Amino acid sequence: MKIRKKKMKLKGKVKKYLMDKLNDNEKLHFSLLDPFKINSSEELKYIAKNLYNVGTDAFLIGGTLGVSKDKLDFVISLLDDYEIPKIIFPSNINLLSEKADALLFLSLLNSDDIYYVIGAQIVAAPIIKMLQIEVIPTAYVIVGHGGTAAHIGKARVIPYDNFELATAYTLAAEYLGMDFVYLEAGSGAPEPIRPEMISFIKKASSIPLIIGGGIRSVEVALKLVEAGANIIVTGNIIERDVDKAIKIIRGIKNK
């Protein structure tokens, strides 16, 4: 197992870091850590060390419910030793921290509530400017099960088998100038985004795809990667079975 060098400063360089890897045809993995579900600093240190050592490319920090600013800062601080980016995955404007390397600046494109499409972003923008957090413009699109994120975000979820609609959203995001499209099946979803949807989208758009939700095995992750997913996100499996998460990361990084 290769231990990677620590303490490379990434503030202001996260988008370049990610794009350089993608341009080298790497497939990436993000580890989603929910501060609300972390029971102790010892647990977080153990999980983070193992995920880092097998090659996860970034830590995403965030959750839909129960995350305070203090807990967010605490988790980011504990991850500070690792050279990979610490990226905020915000559910609302309370999840902003100057300690992070970057922020996914999300717009929930298929929400029926304008607040989640552009309202929260307007409120957050001056704060982000003041805190000098690097932003990564990302279209967030919820598919299938959707979970808590769909409920809170009032999303009109895209059916798992409606490839044309998912492609239309992806193209809209590309034309709006987004850097990424994040297709989300929802935390703990009974099934992930279908590989057929990803390959269908990739025939029409070259925008990098982040895929998350319902990914519980290396076999599923590899099918998504083979279909064209650029970045795989796992969260629940990290909390439930870190050894399975490690296998997923190894599979993706050895692809």
Curated annotation (Swiss-Prot):
It comes from the Archaea. Sn-glycerol 1-phosphate binds at Y182, L183, E184, A185, G186, S187, G188, G213, G214, G235, N236. Its EC number is 2.5.1.41. Pathway: Membrane lipid metabolism; glycerophospholipid metabolism. Mg(2+) binds at D34, T64. Its main location: cytoplasm. It is found in: Cytoplasm. It is an enzyme of class 2 (transferase). PANTHER family: HEPTAPRENYLGLYCERYL PHOSPHATE SYNTHASE (PTHR40029:SF2), PTHR40029. This is Geranylgeranylglyceryl phosphate synthase.
